[in-house]
A protein has these predicted regions:
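Positively charged n-region of N-terminal signal peptides that target proteins for export
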Residues: 1-4, 141
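Subset of outer-membrane beta-barrel
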Residues: 18-340
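Bacterial N-terminal signal peptides
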Residues: 4-15
């Protein structure tokens, strides 16, 4: 037990730091959206207690006894040659404990390789893989806590790295009020093996709070998630554009001051699920930060919005999501849940 505590502390301390956004951390595949339902809700929904294994990888404290025997298979045909998928399984242990496991892959495909002079010298492959083991413990009728342990492996050509990370979660659920709140600390850990000797990089540590509310007589559930609370200022300015001028305002980009409302909204993901009976859900969400970072200034389009639906047919639960990241196109997410 003492050895376990020492290991966890040694992994936590390097993670409790700020400024890990905008490409300054490694293994961002740890933040990939594990299911179509999560993707439809803006990439962040963590406070729904309805025994759906699609949410277990995001919040381990949502694993419950009704998930026992559930299997989830997810697939996304992402941008360029990248695609990723996820498989998960949940099991009831006893009156207090439940567990789940998942396996994630991200395949980037073959890429052209060039030398320092720009000559094509062949191709190389890149991929990422994560094994997650999670458990939940029911404290009382209102509170459940959970833990995910994730082992991550990535390779780029001849370079590879291994990382170990933990997610800690707690969920408060009051069914009579239709209210749920969740608290998550994600990706607490460190690299066990670095890509290059002596170059240790940070994992994408994150603190989230999420709430959902379902009005008693309305077939809708509202979701609000505050993400990346470990860092207030999530605005991003490209350091390579030190003298760039905004074509609309004429301001120097690096001199731009972000307003309080803009900084606040970069933490917020809001969405809703329309519950059309027990077998159909229509989902939609808006991710403000995604729109600000990926939408074009003069033609943002639908960047930041995501939509989807869930359909139960006998023993199968099908989910689909269309997440719009950029004017270049959306990503289509598919998930299938069934029991064995």
């Amino acid at each position: 037990m003492r050895l376990c505590l020492v290991l966890i502390v040694s992994l936590v301390l390097p993670s409790l730091s700020f400024g890990q956004l905008g490409g300054t951390s490694v293994f961002n595949g740890l933040n990939i959206q594990p299911s179509a339902r999560v993707a439809a809700m803006g990439g962040a929904i963590n406070a729904v207690v309805d025994s759906d294994i699609q949410l277990a990888a995001i919040n381990p404290s949502l694993i419950d006894s009704a998930m026992s025997g559930s299997v989830m298979l997810s697939y996304v045909d992402y941008f360029a040659k990248t695609n990723f998928g996820n498989a998960a399984y949940a099991r009831h242990i006893n009156s207090k404990w439940n567990a789940a496991a998942s396996l994630l892959f991200i395949a980037h495909g073959a890429m052209d390789q060039y030398d320092a002079l720009g000559n094509n010298i062949g191709s190389f492959n890149a991929g990422e893989y994560a094994l997650s083991l999670g458990a939940s413990y029911k404290v009382d009728s209102l509170w459940t806590v959970g833990l995910n342990q994730k082992t991550f492996y990535a390779n780029i050509a001849e370079y590879n790295s291994v990382a170990l990370a933990f997610d800690f979660a707690a969920t408060y659920h009051k069914p009579s009020k239709g209210f749920t709140a969740a608290f998550l600390v994600r990706n607490v850990g460190a690299q066990l093996k670095t890509f290059t000797p002596g170059t240790r990089e940070k994992l994408p540590f994150e603190f989230q709070i999420g709430i959902t509310k379902k009005p008693k007589y309305a077939p809708i559930r509202f979701s609000l998630v505050a993400e990346n609370l470990q860092q207030w200022d999530l605005s991003y300015v490209n350091p390579n554009e030190a003298n760039a001028v905004d074509p609309l305002t004429g301001e120097l980009i690096n001199d731009r001051k972000f307003q309080f409302g803009d900084l606040l909204m970069r933490h917020i993901v809001m969405g809703a699920e329309f519950l059309l009976g027990e077998n159909i859900q229509i989902r939609g969400a808006y991710n403000y930060r995604r729109r600000q970072e990926l939408g074009l200034t003069d033609r943002p389009g639908m960047a930041g919005f995501s939509f989807g639906m869930g359909l139960r047919i006998k023993k199968f639960h099908l989910s689909y999501a269309r997440a719009i990241y950029h004017l270049a196109g959306p990503a289509n997410h598919f998930s299938l849940v069934f029991k064995v």
